[in-house]
Structure formats: structure tokens, C-alpha cells
């Protein structure tokens, strides 16, 4: 089987397509292992679908299946277009719902499923948090310095609320910074698309940023996010890192 490694805003993924739908939790752990496998934040498997260009299975590095991954959706869209599974404009099915994406060279824009505010009144460690679903649940707080990111606090909150944890900083009306602790990876990652989206959405709701902003994660790779007609879009570059072949995968 041909496997392709992609990077999107600092998140990396192993992607392939097949006709067989089955549980691939153990395969995800094997392929995503940083020392004994290819190494990635997640495994994406594309499958044919009767109504959409394709559907996907997305697995975190620990083998857990996730409803959605923002940067993963952009990598998957680029893969699908590059390997003839979809045109430049596509729709595909995730556990969170239908995702729309468009590809132009190495830049991909995805429209996320409709976001939901789950809780506005969380107080933890002297900080106010919001729980927001942008395909997967995210806790969001704002700080004056991203060095205030606390991995131990993030791990505790991730387990308490079963959510990803995001620290955001508002630099000005058009620029936001984010650091994210991701469940499934169980560590801080270089980027998280749905986390960046949740942080932007909360800032926009507060009226402290414009409807179109640049968001910068730990990787330093910029993403453009916009909120338009109650729809959330995000756009950025993706990179095909390499292709490889592995026997016994289907």
C-alpha cells in the first residue's frame, strides 16, 4: 500500500485510500509512532462514498478515532485532489458532518461544521474558560503571554472535560496566537486547526477581532480564518512530505 505523509501548519499525518472500511486503531498507533513508525499526529484513511467525494476515518496517534481534525481536513483534501479522488472543489464526510474544501496549488481552504458554544461559565485556576465544539470539543482561555501555557494544567483539564485545551492571545484586531494541548496526542502539538478555529470564534464573539484574522500556532505557520454567514472557514498551506510503501496494509 502506498502511504503519504503530509504536513499542515505543523500537524503531520499519514494518509492513504482504500475500499475497505474497518477498525484501524492498532495500525494508527503503529504508523504514528515517532520512533518505531513513520511518525505523525494522526492517520487518515479515505474511503469511497455514494453521495460525497469520499468519507474518512481519522485516528489520533494513540489509536482513538476522532470526529474531526481541521488541519487533517486540509491535508486530506489536497491528497484527494492530487491522487484523482476529487476535483478542486469537494465535499467529504467525517464523523462531525460534511466538510467542504477547495484546493489551489498548495493552499487549501476548508469549511468546518457549524460551531457550537457548549459552556460559557467555566472557572479553573483563576482563569475563565469557554467550551466550544468546532467538530471536536475545545476549552479556550485568553492570556497576556503564551508562555503562560501550562502543560500540567492542560492535561488535568483535558481529562476533566474530555476536551482539547487552548491558550490564546489577542495581538490586535487581525492577529491571534494559539497554543494547544491535544487529546489523542496527549501533549502540546505544533498546531491544531479546530483549536485555532475555536479560539478565533471566541475572540470574534467578544468583539475583539475582525471577521477575518491570521492565527499563528506554535509552529509559526500562519492560517487565515474567517467567519461569514455563520460559517467558519480556514485556509493555509499544506505540504506533501514524502511517499512510501508498506506491505500488508489495506
Curated annotation (Swiss-Prot):
InterPro entries linked: DAP_epimerase_AS, DAP_epimerase_DapF
GO biological process terms on file: lysine biosynthetic process via diaminopimelate
Annotated residues for binding of substrate: 11, 60, 70-71, 164, 182-183, 193-194
Pathway given in the UniProt record: Amino-acid biosynthesis; L-lysine biosynthesis via DAP pathway; DL-2,6-diaminopimelate from LL-2,6-diaminopimelate: step 1/1
Reactions performed catalytically: (2S,6S)-2,6-diaminopimelate = meso-2,6-diaminopimelate
Subunit and partners: Homodimer.
Role of this protein: Catalyzes the stereoinversion of LL-2,6-diaminopimelate (L,L-DAP) to meso-diaminopimelate (meso-DAP), a precursor of L-lysine and an essential component of the bacterial peptidoglycan.
Record-given protein name: Diaminopimelate epimerase
Organism: Nitratiruptor sp. (strain SB155-2)
Amino acid at each position: 500500500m502506498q502511504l503519504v505523509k503530509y504536513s499542515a501548519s505543523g500537524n503531520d499525518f499519514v494518509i492513504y485510500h482504500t475500499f475497505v472500511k474497518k477498525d484501524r486503531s492498532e495500525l494508527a498507533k503503529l504508523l504514528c509512532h515517532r520512533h518505531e513508525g513513520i511518525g505523525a499526529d494522526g492517520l487518515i484513511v479515505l474511503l469511497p462514498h455514494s453521495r460525497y467525494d469520499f468519507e474518512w476515518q481519522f485516528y489520533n496517534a494513540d489509536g482513538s478515532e476522532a470526529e474531526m481534525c481541521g488541519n487533517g481536513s486540509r491535508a486530506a483534501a489536497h491528497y484527494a485532489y492530487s491522487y484523482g479522488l476529487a476535483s478542486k472543489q469537494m465535499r467529504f464526510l467525517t464523523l462531525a458532518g460534511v466538510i467542504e474544501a477547495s484546493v489551489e496549488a498548495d493552499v487549501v481552504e476548508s469549511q468546518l461544521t457549524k460551531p457550537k458554544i457548549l459552556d460559557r461559565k467555566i472557572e479553573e485556576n483563576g482563569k475563565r474558560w469557554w467550551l466550544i465544539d468546532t467538530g471536536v470539543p475545545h476549552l479556550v482561555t485568553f492570556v497576556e503571554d503564551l508562555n503562560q501555557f501550562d502543560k500540567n494544567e492542560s492535561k488535568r483539564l483535558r481529562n476533566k472535560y474530555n476536551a482539547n485545551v487552548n491558550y490564546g492571545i489577542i495581538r490586535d484586531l487581525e492577529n491571534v496566537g494559539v497554543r494547544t494541548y491535544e487529546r489523542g496526542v496527549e501533549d502540546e502539538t505544533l498546531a491544531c486547526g479546530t483549536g485555532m478555529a475555536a479560539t478565533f470564534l471566541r475572540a470574534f464573539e467578544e468583539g475583539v477581532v475582525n471577521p477575518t484574522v491570521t492565527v499563528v500556532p506554535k509552529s509559526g505557520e500562519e492560517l487565515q480564518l474567517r467567519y461569514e454567514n455563520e460559517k467558519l472557514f480556514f485556509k493555509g498551506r499544506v505540504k506533501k512530505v514524502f511517499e512510501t510503501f508498506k506491505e500488508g496494509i489495506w
